Amino acid sequence: MPYRSRPDVGRQGRLSQPTVPKLPASLTAAKLPDDDLRDEGVCLSLEYVDADLSKRDVASVEIDRCRFKTVNFGRTELDRALISDSVFEGCDFANLRTRDCSLTRVSLASSRMTGVSWIQGSLRQVTFEGCRMDMASFRFSQFKSVVFSGCRLAQADFQEADLRGARFDRCDLTGAQFSKAQMEGTRFADCGLDGLNGVTSLRGSIITGRDALALVYSLAGALGITIEDD
C-alpha cells in the first residue's frame, strides 16, 4: 500500500496557519540582466521592483529570501524551480507554466495568476491572498498548510491534487474541477461553490452550512438525482 502523507494540523485538528516567509532585514536591489532568472541560477536576498521577467524558459533556478513587487512573470516557463521564504506582491503570473516546482514559506498577494499551470508541484506553508486565479491548474500537486483567501478561482483545476492541507476562505470556486483529488480535512468557508466538477471527491472535506447549500445541485447531478420544484 503506498504511503500517504498526513496534512499539517494543529492540536485541535484544524489546519495549521502557514509560516510567514523569513526575509532578511534588508534586501539588495535586483538589477537586470545580472539578476535575471537563468538555468541553475540562485537569486538570494534580492528585491525586484517593476521588473520584466516574462517569457523566460528556465530550469532548476533557486529563489530564496526575495521580494517581488509588481513584477511581470507572464508566459514564463519554470522547470524544477525551488522558491522559498519569498514574497510576491501585485505581480503578473498570467499563463506561467511550471513543472515539478516547489513553494515553501511563500506569500502571494494581489497578483494576477489567470491561466497559471502549476503541474506536479509542491506547496508548503503558502498563502494566496486577493489573487485572481481564473482557470489556474494545480493538477497532481501537493498542498501542505496552504491558504487561499479572497481569491478568484473560477474554473480552476485541482484534478488529482492532494488538498488535505489546504483551506479556502472567501474564494470564488465557481466551476472548479476537483476530480480524484484527496480532500480529507480540506476546509471551505464563505466560498462560491456553484457548478463544481468532481464534487464526489469532496468526501471528508469540511464546509460551512451556507456553502453546503450551493453543492446540492452539483451533488444531485453527480448522483443522477432530478430535483423538481414543488
What is each residue range found by the language model?
Residues P2-D230:
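Tandem repeat scaffolds
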